Every structure is written in structure tokens, then in C-alpha cells.
Amino acid sequence: MNKTELINAVAEASELSKKDATKAVDSVFDTILDALKNGDKIQLIGFGNFEVRERSARKGRNPQTGEEIEIPASKVPAFKPGKALKDAVAGK
């Protein structure tokens, strides 16, 4: 499912217009993004957690030359599914 399909599903399930569903979906995504940029953790009980994780510096290799390079530390977004989401996907 892509973003357009998600918006259509939200519009249908909530009886919103596609315009209002688009605003709602975009607002949720923007709010999650802003929270992660600020270093906050988003906890949606039963669904899962969005957070920023630190990836430490490490050594890598240039695949074209084989030269060893240093990959700097970085921050990456992460999602950890909650128990209810895991159970629903597993059919429990």
C-alpha cells in the first residue's frame, strides 16, 4: 500500500473526503517527523514505537575500489512494533 492508497482507505473508513483524509494523513506524518527531529520517542500503545537510534561509526569498504573507508556515526529513524500489532499480523 502506498500513500495514495492509504489516504483512500482512511477516507473510506472514516467517511472523510479525500481532501480531509489527505490533511489527516499528512498531519500524522508531519507530527511524527517533527517529534523525531526533536529527539522525541512516539509511543502508540499496542501499535508500536517510533524513535531515533544512534548508529555508531564503523569501517566500511568502497565496493568499486575495495578501499577501506570510515563511515561516520549517524542518527536513523526506527520503528519497533507493539505486541498487539505483532499478534494481529500473526493472526492471533
Swiss-Prot record:
<keyword id="KW-0226">DNA condensation</keyword>
<protein>
    <recommendedName>
        <fullName>DNA-binding protein HU 1</fullName>
    </recommendedName>
</protein>
<comment type="subunit">
    <text>Homodimer.</text>
</comment>
<comment type="function">
    <text>Histone-like DNA-binding protein which introduces negative supercoils in relaxed plasmid DNA in the presence of topoisomerase I. There are at least 20,000 monomers/cell. Capable of wrapping DNA to stabilize it, and thus to prevent its denaturation under extreme environmental conditions. Binds evenly across chromosome, does not display a preference for AT content. Binds ss- and dsDNA in a sequence non-specific manner; 8 nucleotides are sufficient to bind protein.</text>
</comment>
<keyword id="KW-0963">Cytoplasm</keyword>
<keyword id="KW-0238">DNA-binding</keyword>
<comment type="similarity">
    <text>Belongs to the bacterial histone-like protein family.</text>
</comment>
<dbReference type="InterPro" id="IPR000119">
    <property type="entry name" value="Hist_DNA-bd"/>
</dbReference>
<dbReference type="GO" id="GO:0009295">
    <property type="term" value="C:nucleoid"/>
</dbReference>
<dbReference type="GO" id="GO:0030261">
    <property type="term" value="P:chromosome condensation"/>
</dbReference>
<dbReference type="GO" id="GO:0030527">
    <property type="term" value="F:structural constituent of chromatin"/>
</dbReference>
<dbReference type="Pfam" id="PF00216">
    <property type="entry name" value="Bac_DNA_binding"/>
</dbReference>
<keyword id="KW-0597">Phosphoprotein</keyword>
<comment type="subunit">
    <text>(Microbial infection) Interacts with Bacillus phage SP01 Gp46; the interaction replaces dsDNA from the hbs-DNA complex.</text>
</comment>
<dbReference type="InterPro" id="IPR020816">
    <property type="entry name" value="Histone-like_DNA-bd_CS"/>
</dbReference>
<feature type="modified residue" description="Phosphothreonine">
    <location>
        <position position="4"/>
    </location>
</feature>
<dbReference type="GO" id="GO:0003677">
    <property type="term" value="F:DNA binding"/>
</dbReference>
<dbReference type="GO" id="GO:0005829">
    <property type="term" value="C:cytosol"/>
</dbReference>
<dbReference type="InterPro" id="IPR010992">
    <property type="entry name" value="IHF-like_DNA-bd_dom_sf"/>
</dbReference>
